[in-house]
A protein has these predicted regions:
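Short cysteine/histidine-rich zinc-coordinating motifs and their immediately flanking basic loops
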Residues: 124-130, 280-285
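Bacterial N-terminal signal peptides
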Residues: 7-18
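Detector for the c-type heme attachment site
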Residues: 115-122, 146-147, 183-186, 271-277, ...
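Extended intrinsically disordered, low-complexity coil regions enriched in Ser, Thr, Gly, Ala
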Residues: 131-160, 193, 286-292, 296-297, ...
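Positively charged n-region of N-terminal signal peptides that target proteins for export
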Residues: 1-4
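Short, intrinsically disordered C-terminal tails of secreted or membrane-associated proteins
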Residues: 364, 368-378
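Flexible coil segments in periplasmic/lumen-exposed cytochrome c-class electron-transfer proteins
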Residues: 24-111, 153-266, 302-354, 365
């Protein structure tokens, strides 16, 4: 049985590495910031050069075997696990009917959203978890990708380049359908479990994700100034895209308390809600992947994200240190979203890059005013 599991993991790795290479849009020739928090990006060591005359790895043929996953009554073939003709959905009871753009996509222009972000929208450390995002926020992010206003500080982050390509190809109807589907899904509780440690399990990096080493390679090492986020149930369930298999985020001892103090100082709750559960079009933060959150904060800091409302975040992140990123993302990830959906879902249409958010009165977001007057604030 162990050999079967290993063969399955190897099969999925071959398939996904081929997909990633085929789908990544060319990255611009930009330098990598010298202060990049590599733990958040899962930066992989350079691959060895291919052997002369070596044929590219190919996935094993689908022999029709039905694969099963613990906790699911669904059975899938290897072809179905690759997302053909629709994404692997081990837990259809988690959600309502999926629109075609989420379940099938429109290949080759647009990959199915649910393949990478999962049918329940919980996402994975290397990407985003769109579950529970308001329709207006989701659509605005797609506009930002489309208009090159949302990139990655690290040009090697291939799936961001891929998202930019998808956003340029997706129709407004497809984007809206995906936005409405994910907005209706609950923000998951306990998806990320935060553990404060001084020593962290040794890991390897594959596909920008950390996996705990096993066997003779297993061991511990100092965590240092990092967050190490790993699949809670190992690599096999991760590679099979199990939407019930969450993550463990190992953080330095004391990081959560320090992050709480920093969030209070920056008054994050003024815009993101009292419990960071989101407020109107402002996204929920509680319980989200610390790897993802650190990338976004750093992208605001470097200007890689400079879409609508990014000016509100710039003063917040301007002086954040590498330690601040670790602490505040540890705190954010440690907070569970509310059991009931108390978010105020925004109904407004996404604003263009030439429009400005309008606020009544002087609402304060952190240390800066959220009040904008149309035409007077650069985005």
């Amino acid at each position: 049985m162990r050999k079967i599991h290993l063969a399955l993991v190897a099969f999925v790795l071959v398939v996904m590495s081929g997909y990633a290479l085929a789908q990544q849009a060319p990255a611009p020739a930009r330098p990598v910031p010298t202060n990049l928090p590599e733990w958040a990006w899962g930066v992989m060591p350079p691959a060895p050069p291919p052997q002369p005359g070596a044929a590219p790895a190919a996935p094993p043929a689908d022999d029709g075997s039905i694969l099963h996953l613990e906790g699911s009554s669904v059975g899938l073939t290897r072809t179905q696990l690759r997302g053909i003709p629709s994404i692997p959905d081990w837990h259809p009871e988690d959600h309502g009917p999926m629109p075609d753009i989420v379940s099938k996509g429109r290949m080759p222009a647009v990959r199915a959203c649910g393949f990478c972000h999962l049918p329940n929208g919980r996402g994975r450390p290397e990407n985003a978890g769109p579950a529970g995002l308001s329709v207006s926020y989701f659509m605005q992010q797609m506009e930002d990708f489309k208009n090159d206003l949302r990139k990655s500080s690290d040009p090697r982050k291939g799936n961001v380049n891929t998202m930019i390509g998808f956003a340029k190809q997706a129709t407004p109807e497809e984007v809206k359908a995906a936005a409405e589907y994910f907005a209706a899904l609950p923000i998951p509780q306990g998806w990320v479990k935060v553990k404060e440690v001084s020593m962290v399990p040794k890991t390897k990096i594959q596909g920008n994700v950390y996996f705990e080493l096993e066997g003779a390679q297993a061991g511990k090492e100092p965590i240092g100034n990092r967050v190490i986020e790993v699949p809670e149930h190992g690599q096999e369930r991760f590679e099979m895209r199990d939407g019930h298999a969450g993550y463990i985020a190992y953080v330095p001892v004391g990081a959560v308390k320090k992050g709480e103090a920093l969030a209070s100082k920056l008054q994050c709750s003024m815009c993101h809600g009292a419990n960071l559960e989101g407020l109107g079009p402002v996204p929920a933060l509680a319980g989200r992947s610390p790897s993802y959150m650190a990338r976004q904060l750093f992208d605001f800091q470097t200007g890689a994200r400079h879409g609508l409302w990014s000016d509100l975040m710039k003063p917040i992140v301007a002086k954040m240190t590498a330690e601040d990123l670790v602490n505040i993302t540890a705190y954010i990830a440690s907070k569970n979203p509310p059991a009931a959906d108390v978010r105020q879902t925004a109904r407004a249409k996404p604003q263009s890059r030439h429009s400005r958010p309008m606020w009544n009165g002087s609402t304060i977001c952190g240390s800066i005013s959220c009040r904008f007057v149309s035409g007077h604030s650069r985005v």
